[in-house]
Amino acid sequence: MPPNNSKYVLDPVSIKSVCGGEESYIRCVEYGKKKAHYSNLNLLAKAILAGMFVGLCAHASGIAGGLFYYHKLREIVGASMSVFVYGFTFPIAFMCIICTGSDLFTGNTLAVTMALYEKKVKLLDYLRVMTISLFGNYVGAVSFAFFVSYLSGAFTNVHAVEKNHFFQFLNDIAEKKVHHTFVECVSLAVGCNIFVCLAVYFVLTLKDGAGYVFSVFFAVYAFAIAGYEHIIANIYTLNIALMVNTKITVYQAYIKNLLPTLLGNYIAGAIVLGLPLYFIYKEHYYNFERSKRDNNDAQMKSLSIELRN
């Protein structure tokens, strides 16, 4: 427990390029608290934009991976090259989300939940933010799947083996996702959102652009190449797979994958990461709040949240 006379000054002009653990936690809580003040329309617009970015880069990743899924090339380099290229392309989505200040449900499971733990967000506001965020992400991802991926014919089954590698790559990914058991899917979703929430935490911890890119890229690359399950990415992938008539059903997509993935992602952010961080740093946040009151809110004027929304 920190001493009672601890003072916390969050200085955006500091020469430090990395925040300490206490400051990172405070920034994360303040970031989550800020979301509760947005209007429903603002939240929805940000969430739709984030869902669209996930769809944009999932489409690009599918095309990139599909290029190496060409049957003759696959015989030489193996299917693992497609997975490597897929994982290497997908992190661009999270860089787009960070740079535009859009709103991703999976990151909110950590930041907004910690603000709830600190009683800086009311339960009804918490439910409002999380619901609108998830709904907006869904609308953005599915809209992109239909208006770009489906209407462009990028993943259409052309019934010619030498031209069908994009469809086959998508089909194989979708089939693998819907054939996990419930427990397997939840576990893979927990692993995924640990990386995603850490990517958010990295951005709040680091104070330079190169650090953002480097840390976010490898955090997201790790979950993408490991085959973890991300609810918004899966919403795009499984819906475009349904649109182009792959070998999966609506029941498999929504009940066997999306439902347990949603549960696992939430557990990772709210419980696996959120609770330990809260118990470790709650006294530091209490002292920060007390310092803010003692100094007539002077400390808050210097608070800089790098992940702007």
UniProtKB/Swiss-Prot annotation:
Keywords: Cell membrane, Membrane, Transmembrane, Transmembrane helix, Transport, Vacuole. Its main location: membrane. It catalyses: (S)-lactate(in) + H(+)(in) = (S)-lactate(out) + H(+)(out); formate(in) + H(+)(in) = formate(out) + H(+)(out); pyruvate(out) + H(+)(out) = pyruvate(in) + H(+)(in); acetate(out) + H(+)(out) = acetate(in) + H(+)(in). Inhibited by diethylpyrocarbonate (DEPC). Protonophores, such as 2,4-dinitrophenol and carbonylcyanide-3-chlorophenylhydrazone, abolish transport. Inhibited by phloretin, furosemide, alpha-cyano-4-hydroxy-cinnamate and alpha-fluorocinnamate. Inhibited by the Malaria Box compound MMV007839 and its derivatives BH296 and BH267.meta. Inhibited by the Malaria Box compound MMV000972. Inhibited by broad-specificity anion transport inhibitor NPPB. The chain crosses the membrane at residues 41-68, 80-100, 123-150, 182-206, 210-226, 250-280. Pfam families: Form_Nir_trans. It is found in: Cell membrane; Vacuole membrane. Residues 69-79, 151-163, 180-181, 227-249 are extracellular. Residues 1-19, 36-40, 101-122, 207-209, 281-309 are cytoplasmic. One of its GO terms (cellular component) is plasma membrane. Changing G21E: Does not affect growth rates of yeast cells when transporter expressed in the strain lacking endogenous monocarboxylate transporters. Disruption phenotype: Conditional knockdown results in the failure of parasites to progress through the asexual stages. No significant effects on gametocyte development. It is a multi-pass membrane protein. Homopentamer. Monocarboxylate-proton symporter that mediates the efflux of the waste product lactate in the intraerythrocytic parasites; active in acidic-to-neutral pH range. Transports L-lactate. Transports D-lactate, pyruvate, acetate and formate. Essential for asexual growth but dispensable for the development of gametocytes. This is Formate-nitrite transporter. It comes from Plasmodium falciparum (isolate 3D7). The lineage of its organism: Eukaryota, Sar, Alveolata, Apicomplexa, Aconoidasida.
